[in-house]
Amino acid sequence: MVDRWAADLEPAGFWWLPAPEANPVGGLVRHIGIASVRLLYRGRGEEIPEPFRSLPPEQLRPTHEAPEAVLEEFRGNMRFVREGLAALREADLEAPRQWGSNPPVRALYIFDHICNHAQHHAGQIITTRKLWNARRAS
């Protein structure tokens, strides 16, 4: 779904901010990929590697990188997540995992959050793209 709404955007639309506190499509694409990998590591009870430790404000900011480079990073991250989820066993889903300051939760809830989180931000990408299209049409 991300490719459908983001892949053909020119750089101006990919990094456009519809409002001062809003996020650009490019930042949302990057954030979905990085956060999904981070959640996979957290759900597996593994240490999160340095490249995936950046916080959302850093991931979401406009960098004006080439859209294709950001999309390739996203695709690679999501491929890694799909492969990681496919390799899980039932015992992996039931394992207690620490998540923030909450009491431990079943890893399944963290893995489920990968989908919920990505879907939420994909909706933002769609909305931002529609706003960009409307702006360009007027």
Name the predicted role of every residue range.
Residues 3, 11-58, 97-138:
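Short, contiguous alpha-helical
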Residues 58-98, 106-117:
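Acidic/histidine-rich alpha-helical segments that form the ligand environment
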Residues 9-12, 82:
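Short, solvent-exposed, charged loop/turn and helix-capping segments
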